[in-house]
A protein has these predicted regions:
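His/Asp/Glu-enriched, well-ordered alpha-helical/loop segment
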Residues: 1-71
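Glycine-rich, flexible loop segments associated with nucleotide phosphate handling
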Residues: 26-33, 87-95, 126
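Residue-level detector of solvent-exposed, low-hydrophobicity positions
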Residues: 15, 19-22, 26, 47, ...
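C-terminal cap of metal-dependent C-N hydrolases
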Residues: 63-119
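Cofactor-binding beta-sheet edge motifs in enzyme active sites
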Residues: 10-11, 117-126
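Ligand-binding pocket scaffold of soluble enzyme catalytic domains
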Residues: 51, 98-99, 106, 125-130
Length: 130
Protein backbone atom coordinates (compact mmCIF):
# COMPACT_ATOMS: atom_id res chain seq x y z
CA UNK A 1 0.00 0.00 0.00
CA UNK A 2 1.34 3.39 -0.97
CA UNK A 3 0.27 4.80 2.42
CA UNK A 4 2.59 2.48 4.35
CA UNK A 5 5.85 2.88 2.45
CA UNK A 6 7.91 5.12 4.70
CA UNK A 7 7.25 4.60 8.36
CA UNK A 8 9.16 1.66 9.81
CA UNK A 9 12.80 2.89 9.87
CA UNK A 10 14.28 -0.59 10.15
CA UNK A 11 17.94 0.51 9.80
CA UNK A 12 17.60 3.14 12.52
CA UNK A 13 15.76 0.73 14.80
CA UNK A 14 18.46 -1.89 14.31
CA UNK A 15 21.25 0.57 15.09
CA UNK A 16 19.41 1.76 18.21
CA UNK A 17 18.86 -1.84 19.34
CA UNK A 18 22.56 -2.59 18.90
CA UNK A 19 23.61 0.64 20.66
CA UNK A 20 21.24 -0.07 23.57
CA UNK A 21 22.67 -3.59 23.91
CA UNK A 22 26.20 -2.15 23.96
CA UNK A 23 25.20 0.47 26.56
CA UNK A 24 23.75 -2.32 28.75
CA UNK A 25 27.01 -4.34 28.44
CA UNK A 26 25.14 -7.12 26.63
CA UNK A 27 26.25 -6.40 23.08
CA UNK A 28 24.45 -8.47 20.46
CA UNK A 29 27.09 -7.31 17.94
CA UNK A 30 29.39 -4.35 17.41
CA UNK A 31 28.12 -1.21 15.71
CA UNK A 32 30.50 -1.95 12.84
CA UNK A 33 28.92 -5.39 12.42
CA UNK A 34 25.44 -3.84 12.44
CA UNK A 35 26.38 -1.37 9.71
CA UNK A 36 27.97 -4.20 7.70
CA UNK A 37 24.76 -6.27 8.03
CA UNK A 38 22.76 -3.44 6.46
CA UNK A 39 25.26 -2.55 3.73
CA UNK A 40 27.99 -4.88 2.49
CA UNK A 41 26.36 -8.07 3.72
CA UNK A 42 23.12 -7.34 1.86
CA UNK A 43 24.99 -6.20 -1.25
CA UNK A 44 26.88 -9.49 -1.26
CA UNK A 45 23.65 -11.46 -0.81
CA UNK A 46 22.02 -9.67 -3.75
CA UNK A 47 25.22 -9.90 -5.80
CA UNK A 48 25.60 -6.17 -6.40
CA UNK A 49 28.76 -4.09 -6.26
CA UNK A 50 27.79 -1.81 -3.37
CA UNK A 51 27.87 -1.60 0.41
CA UNK A 52 31.52 -0.64 0.78
CA UNK A 53 33.55 2.55 0.85
CA UNK A 54 36.45 2.12 -1.56
CA UNK A 55 38.47 4.46 -3.72
CA UNK A 56 36.90 4.74 -7.17
CA UNK A 57 33.47 3.40 -6.11
CA UNK A 58 30.20 5.30 -6.05
CA UNK A 59 29.98 7.31 -2.86
CA UNK A 60 26.65 6.19 -1.39
CA UNK A 61 26.96 7.31 2.23
CA UNK A 62 24.62 8.10 5.12
CA UNK A 63 26.01 10.18 8.00
CA UNK A 64 24.19 9.64 11.30
CA UNK A 65 24.45 11.34 14.69
CA UNK A 66 24.53 8.49 17.22
CA UNK A 67 23.75 10.86 20.11
CA UNK A 68 20.28 11.44 18.61
CA UNK A 69 19.18 7.82 19.07
CA UNK A 70 17.68 8.68 22.47
CA UNK A 71 14.35 9.57 20.84
CA UNK A 72 11.28 7.43 20.14
CA UNK A 73 11.89 5.77 16.77
CA UNK A 74 8.37 4.33 16.67
CA UNK A 75 6.41 7.57 16.55
CA UNK A 76 4.53 7.90 13.23
CA UNK A 77 2.25 10.53 11.73
CA UNK A 78 0.38 11.24 8.52
CA UNK A 79 1.99 13.48 5.89
CA UNK A 80 0.83 14.74 2.50
CA UNK A 81 2.38 13.12 -0.57
CA UNK A 82 3.67 15.65 -3.09
CA UNK A 83 1.87 15.48 -6.47
CA UNK A 84 -0.81 13.14 -5.09
CA UNK A 85 -4.00 13.79 -3.20
CA UNK A 86 -3.00 11.18 -0.64
CA UNK A 87 -1.41 10.99 2.75
CA UNK A 88 1.09 8.40 3.90
CA UNK A 89 2.42 7.24 7.23
CA UNK A 90 5.89 8.60 7.91
CA UNK A 91 8.41 8.29 10.69
CA UNK A 92 10.57 11.36 11.10
CA UNK A 93 13.48 11.26 13.51
CA UNK A 94 15.00 14.74 13.58
CA UNK A 95 18.68 14.98 14.32
CA UNK A 96 19.69 11.43 13.38
CA UNK A 97 20.25 11.52 9.61
CA UNK A 98 22.60 14.46 9.00
CA UNK A 99 23.69 13.84 5.41
CA UNK A 100 22.93 11.43 2.57
CA UNK A 101 25.18 11.18 -0.46
CA UNK A 102 24.09 9.25 -3.53
CA UNK A 103 26.86 8.68 -6.04
CA UNK A 104 28.83 11.44 -4.31
CA UNK A 105 26.04 14.02 -4.56
CA UNK A 106 24.23 15.39 -1.53
CA UNK A 107 20.59 14.31 -1.46
CA UNK A 108 20.32 15.45 2.17
CA UNK A 109 22.67 18.07 3.59
CA UNK A 110 22.43 19.23 7.20
CA UNK A 111 19.13 17.33 7.58
CA UNK A 112 17.55 19.15 4.61
CA UNK A 113 16.61 17.65 1.24
CA UNK A 114 18.62 19.28 -1.53
CA UNK A 115 16.90 20.92 -4.49
CA UNK A 116 19.07 18.96 -6.97
CA UNK A 117 17.80 15.58 -5.72
CA UNK A 118 15.67 13.96 -8.37
CA UNK A 119 16.27 16.75 -10.86
CA UNK A 120 19.92 16.28 -11.80
CA UNK A 121 21.47 13.24 -13.44
CA UNK A 122 23.83 11.18 -11.33
CA UNK A 123 21.85 10.62 -8.16
CA UNK A 124 21.73 6.92 -8.69
CA UNK A 125 21.84 4.12 -11.14
CA UNK A 126 20.48 0.64 -11.63
CA UNK A 127 22.77 -1.82 -9.84
CA UNK A 128 23.10 -5.05 -11.80
CA UNK A 129 23.77 -8.32 -10.03
CA UNK A 130 27.13 -9.88 -10.78
Amino acid sequence: HIRNMAFYNLPLRMLKLVQDSIDESQAIMTMEQAVWRMTGDQADWFGIDAGRIREGDRADVVVLDPTAFDQDLEQVHWADMENFSLERLVNRNPGIVKHVLINGKFAVRNEQLTTERGKEIGFGTFLRAK
